[in-house]
A protein has these predicted regions:
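Bilobed "Venus flytrap"/periplasmic-binding protein-like clamshell domains
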Residues: 21-78, 183
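Short, glycine/charged-enriched secondary-structure capping and boundary segments
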Residues: 7, 51-52, 95-97
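Conserved beta-strand segments of alpha/beta enzyme cores
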Residues: 6, 60-62, 99
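Short coil/turn segments
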Residues: 12-16, 27-29, 38-45, 112, ...
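Glycine/small-residue-rich interface belts in oligomeric ring/scaffold proteins
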Residues: 1-28, 48
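Pocket-lining segment of extracytoplasmic ligand-binding domains
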Residues: 65-151
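Secondary-structure end/capping motifs
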Residues: 126-184
Length: 184
C-alpha cells in the first residue's frame, strides 16, 4: 500500500451486474469444478474469480494459469477465466455442452454492489492538466460512441455484432464511480 497514492475516483471500468467480457467457461456445474485456469492477462478478473469460488461457492480448486485462445481445449471439471474480446465472443456464441458464468453478474447478485475492474491511480496527485485531459477524453468518448464502435470493428478481429458491442459499451460497462463502488 502506498500512502502517497492518489485515485481519480470519478472514472472506472466496472459493471453493475452482467459484464459479458469477464466470464468463466466450463463443461461442469460451478460446484463441480476442481481446477480453475486463470487468464494470464488480468489480475483483477482472476482475483474476482478467486473470491467468487472461495467465498461465495466455497469450492476447493487447483489454480493454473493459461493464455486463452479460440482453439483451446476444455478439460472436464475445469473452469476457464476468459476476458476481453474472446470473452465477448464466447458470451454471444452458442456452445453446446458449455456453461458460461458471468463474473460481474455473480458478484452483483452476491453483494448487491458493482465490481470495478479498473480505475485510474497515481503514485502522486496528478496535475489539473492531466485531470482536464481525462475529463475531456471521457466526454468526447461518450459523445462519439458510434465512431468508437466502427473503430473497434475495423481494428479488431472480433466475431461480435455491432449491436452487441454497442449494448456492451452502453449498458454493461459503467464508467463513473459511485458510492456503491467504494462499498463493493
Amino acid at each position: 500500500r502506498n500512502n502517497n497514492a492518489f485515485s481519480l475516483d470519478q472514472y472506472c471500468i466496472s459493471s453493475k451486474g452482467q459484464v459479458k467480457s469477464v466470464i468463466l467457461v466450463s463443461k461442469s456445474n460451478f460446484r463441480d469444478i476442481d481446477t480453475i485456469f486463470f487468464d494470464s492477462r488480468s489480475k483483477s478478473s482472476n482475483l474476482l474469480m478467486r473470491v467468487i469460488a472461495e467465498k461465495f461457492f466455497k469450492i476447493n480448486f487447483e489454480a493454473k494459469t493459461y493464455v486463452p485462445t479460440r482453439s483451446m481445449i476444455f478439460e472436464p471439471n475445469a473452469g476457464y477465466v476468459v476476458i476481453g474480446d474472446l470473452g465477448l465472443e464466447i458470451s454471444t456464441s452458442k456452445m453446446p455442452g458449455f456453461k458460461i458464468y458471468d463474473l460481474g453478474e455473480i458478484w452483483f447478485n452476491e453483494t448487491g454492489y458493482p465490481f470495478t475492474f479498473a480505475s485510474f491511480n497515481y503514485v502522486k496527485t496528478p496535475s489539473q492538466d492531466v485531470i482536464n485531459v481525462l475529463d475531456s477524453s471521457f466526454g468526447r468518448g461518450i459523445k462519439s460512441l458510434e465512431k468508437i464502435l466502427d473503430y473497434i470493428k475495423n481494428i479488431n478481429d472480433i466475431n461480435v455484432s455491432h449491436k452487441f458491442i454497442k449494448e456492451y459499451l452502453e449498458k454493461n460497462i459503467v464508467y463513473e464511480f459511485s458510492k456503491d463502488h467504494f462499498s463493493g
